[in-house]
Amino acid sequence: MKDQCENDAISGISDELLLSLRKVLGSCSVSFLFGAGVNGKAFPYFAQFNETISAMNQRGLDGSNIETALAHCADEQIRQAVLDTFVDEYNGYRNYRLDNESLLNLRRMLTAFSSIVEKAENRHPETKRLNVFTLNYDRIVEEILEDSGLFCYILTQGKSKGHLPFDIVGYNTTTHAFIPTFCVYKLHGSVDANRNLSSGNIVFPGQDKLGSILSNFYETLFAMKGELLKRNTVLFVIGYSWSDDHVNGIINDAIASGLTVYWLQYRPEDTLPKPLAGHVITIPPVGGIPVDTTKTLAELVERVGRI
């Protein structure tokens, strides 16, 4: 039954795509870029943040897009009021469960990648490291990795100065082998260990966003670019709306230097920014039906492992 379900979910995927995935997973350094959609139904999208949207509308801001609205808001008092509302509302959603179906799909995907990287022969120790660049504030990825017993390293604001894991890869002293190591980079900040978000630990969208990144998170942003510019690197983009111009610019520059990018498309109508169109390999939803893209990628990687 499981094989039949997998066949139904990725039956429209071409053999050419499977072979290309087999090639990159066998030798390339793997990185991920996660946006809000990676959490599926486990955590609300911004469109469900009714209190924040109301606070924005009351202050004359367009509540349909917080990124755009605050990027064009020069009034610091308004920005801070919206930020405080957002933080309070965000913390009201912190009681998510790791056994949510969408998070089980994410767990399955991360485990599948760990397995295929572990089994791949002739890998340089550095390629045993899997980079996870996330724009999300939550600790869902970290909690899943830790709960699954997968070796990981988390880079948050407190570790962003002079303590980057460029050369850290796990090693099994019994088997004398390097093991898959996930390095999670929190590009826009993070909740604390208790899932609590505070305004001082996030880079909130706004006019000073680039400045905030440069002052608090610039090393993390530059680390992302450095990793993606390395030879034989592949990036899997999941749940990302392509709304961050700085991140898009990094990806575009890296593609020009040889980066291979796979984008898991959630809906057929979802599109790439013009500079990236034609340079990114799109994996569409089979049959045009939206489904957790983590599930799609997990099944693809598992199938590649059986080829």
Where are these regions (language model features)?
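Conserved catalytic-core helix/loop/strand module for nucleotide-ribose chemistry
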Residues: 1-229, 234, 240-243, 250-307
